[in-house]
Swiss-Prot record:
The keyword Glycoprotein does not apply. It comes from the Eukaryota. It comes from Homo sapiens. Residues 268-279 have a biased composition (Polar residues). The gene is TNFAIP1. This is BTB/POZ domain-containing adapter for CUL3-mediated RhoA degradation protein 2. It is found in: Cytoplasm; Nucleus; Endosome.
Length: 316
């Protein structure tokens, strides 16, 4: 089990040097703090290969631990879960991004995991012949595909739905210009934040122009840019360009780049430590989880009075 919530050791806690006695403890779980990311794994997994980790957990190297028993490793924990998977299974699926492969290879070199280094080098060599665009904008083909993209994304999601053919009436004089401005702003935001946000386009939805914003798999906000107005005794469709509101909601989703509370796997892995904590600390933890959930609902409920079409489904 592993957890990727960034938690810092308690202030004032002084790490101590100790020798790790690994003999006969193959199935024992150890808790690791790798640059603030917390992991649970077995000594057996860490000592299967002849690496620096094997030296640390077979007693050949001294390790740092904090007062709660977490073993401290002064490295970035971003790719440590991938490294653990390689140590367990002897193989992994490498990231698609060249930069992430380079980062993983640097960590593998530090831990002296030569097999993983070779995998990364081979993948980088293969990618020299095929260039991948930096900014990819998927265009969804079905509601099911949209749901899968949003649920599986580790990044916040911004979706622009535009479908001019949905209009039943004539447009107001500025509507075409405003529709184009919405599309242009989407392209600009995609170029600016493509590394931090997943941008997707929807050209088959039921709206004419509508922005949706998602974080951690749930819908946070929606900005509908169309309305029906009456002019010269007939209905017309008006498309607006609420630029400031779109910028505001895009910046809001950046708050959801990393988990705000520990995930279930981490909470389960650290249940022993929590069971020793005071009741007040447990209450604070659950209050935090509940408060975050209510904020999500409250944030989204401000848009409930708008017609959302097939995007209105919201699961708490």
């Amino acid at each position: 089990m592993s957890g990727d919530t960034c938690l810092c050791p308690a202030s004032g806690a002084k790490p101590k040097l100790s020798g790790f006695k690994g003999g006969g403890l193959g199935n024992k779980y150890v808790q690791l703090n790798v640059g603030g990311s917390l992991y649970y794994t077995t000594v057996r997994a860490l000592t299967r290969h002849d690496t620096m980790l094997k030296a640390m957990f077979s007693g050949r190297m001294e390790v740092l631990t904090d007062k709660e028993g977490w073993i401290l490793i002064d490295r970035c924990g971003k790719h440590f879960g991938t490294i653990l998977n390689y140590l367990r299974d002897d193989t992994i699926t490498l990231p698609q991004n060249r930069q992430e492969i380079k980062e993983l290879m640097a960590e593998a070199k530090y831990y002296l995991i030569q097999g993983l280094v070779n995998m990364c080098q081979s993948a980088l060599q293969d990618k020299k012949d095929s260039y991948q665009p930096v900014c990819n904008i998927p265009i969804i083909t079905s509601l099911k595909e949209e749901e899968r993209l949003i649920e599986s994304s580790t990044k916040p999601v911004v979706k622009l739905l535009y479908n001019r053919s949905n209009n039943k009436y004539s447009y107001t004089s500025n509507s075409d210009d405003h529709l184009l401005k919405n599309i242009e702003l989407f392209d600009k935001l995609s170029l600016r934040f493509n590394g931090r946000v997943l941008f997707i386009k929807d050209v088959i939805g039921d709206e004419i122009c509508c922005w949706s914003f998602y974080g951690q798999g749930r819908k946070l906000a929606e900005v509908c840019c169309t309305s029906i107005v009456y002019a010269t005794e007939k209905k017309q469709t008006k498309v607006e360009f609420p630029e400031a509101r779109i910028y505001e909601e895009t910046l809001n989703v950046l708050l959801y780049e990393t988990p705000r509370v520990p995930d279930n796997s981490l909470l389960e892995a650290t249940s022993r430590s929590r069971s020793q904590a005071s009741p007040s600390e447990d209450e604070e933890t659950f209050e935090l989880r509940d408060r975050v959930r209510r904020i999500h609902v409250k944030r989204y409920s401000t848009y409930d009075d708008r017609q959302l079409g097939h995007q209105s489904t919201h699961r708490d």
